[in-house]
Amino acid sequence: MLDPKYLRSDIAEAAARLATRGYVLDVAAVNALEEKRKDLQSRTQELQAERNARSKSIGEAARRGEDVAPLKAEVTKINEELETSKVELDALLAELKVIADAIPNLPSDTTPVGRDENDNVEVRRWGTPREFSFPVRDHIDLGEAAKGVDFKNGVKLSGSRFVVMKGQIARLHRALAQFMLDLHTLQHGYTECYVPYLVNPDSLYGTGQLPKFSQDLFNTGIDGEGEEEGKVRKFSLIPTSEVPLTNMARDEIFDEQELPIKMTAHSPCFRSEAGSYGRDTRGLIRMHQFDKVEMVQLVHPEKSWEALEEMAGHAEKVLQLLELPYRVMALSTGDMGFCAAKTYDLEVWLPAQNTYREISSVSNCTDFQARRMQARVRIDGKPQLLHTLNGSGLAVGRTLVAVIENYQQEDGRIAIPAALQSYMGGLTHIG
């Protein structure tokens, strides 16, 4: 959520910056609602002051032995007007909140301006794509040949965009997640967390999935136990462990010396993939359920840009140790996620597709999520909004795809990257 004070004082500037994201802010409509809010708020305060003054007069008149019935009648009338004014004000504030909740974060000054992914800017590359002396096979063919990727049973058990992994492919998938966690916790300073896979609406609001992106979620329709009577709180499956990790800061005030807080978690992620019809219908690239190792940082508001570069480096280190060629892209304003002020995508080379594909997104959300969550840090004795960052470190399934395709051998076997062999019991090849 953007700063309401900024929207009120610099709405034209905000609208111009949001327009680079393809978001049209109706300035005239917002200004009209704001004027109405100020009038209603002023009227409500005047009525409260008038009621308090009249109520005080009743006590004074009673002490003098005067008839207080006329004054009580006036107070009753004022209370009726006040109640009407409060109802109108609450309705107007709710309308303004609906608008505010739908406004994305402001792009940073260093975010490339563009309409979509075609306007993303390459920042750097690492590694050289391997030249094969034999016809390249894709991960589906290789995985099925190794009897480790079973889409048929995935469809039978659940439907399209699900898979069953078996044998050494399943083991390799597990090894990748363990390797990533060990790297981030032992070398990069993150604390490993095991988090709930079911979260409440407050959590999804805090990290920006609700209310705008409800169609992307899998909702259980089940209430949590012990909730307040009359308050419906449905559980949803997490689309990423960013949601529970970041929301642990909700309604908290940290001391300055506690920051940065760096957390990581390995979890399944559940996404409806609404709007992805016809895209990546084969293989492991776009699934309803996939595993990811997530990184989250809660930082001092003056240090988030430094933290963004650091987090991108942490994700890159995974690919470097696996010796997988990749490139780093700065996303354009039109391609960024809702909460991000700036995002780097890491794209890994997939030989069978002869292109780079996204394997990680690392974003600085500045104070956007923190404002929704009221996550703060005490600086010079005064609570201020902290900054939140999140990034994939990495998407495990897509990393598996990259390893299978980049490490394929002419005889159909899959070589195990040196960094993973200790996690595979010394195994050097699959197949």
From Swiss-Prot:
Keywords: Aminoacyl-tRNA synthetase, ATP-binding, Cytoplasm, Ligase, Nucleotide-binding, Protein biosynthesis. Residues 41-66 are annotated as: Disordered. The keyword Secreted does not apply. Its main location: cytoplasm. Pathway: Aminoacyl-tRNA biosynthesis; selenocysteinyl-tRNA(Sec) biosynthesis; L-seryl-tRNA(Sec) from L-serine and tRNA(Sec): step 1/1. Signal peptide: none annotated. GO terms for cellular component: cytoplasm. It is found in: Cytoplasm. CDD domains: SerRS_core (cd00770). L-serine binds at T240, S241, E242, E294, S392. HAMAP family: Ser_tRNA_synth_type1. Homodimer. The tRNA molecule binds across the dimer. Catalyzes the attachment of serine to tRNA(Ser). Is also able to aminoacylate tRNA(Sec) with serine, to form the misacylated tRNA L-seryl-tRNA(Sec), which will be further converted into selenocysteinyl-tRNA(Sec). Belongs to the class-II aminoacyl-tRNA synthetase family. Type-1 seryl-tRNA synthetase subfamily. This is Serine--tRNA ligase. It comes from Aeromonas hydrophila subsp. hydrophila (strain ATCC 7966 / DSM 30187 / BCRC 13018 / CCUG 14551 / JCM 1027 / KCTC 2358 / NCIMB 9240 / NCTC 8049).
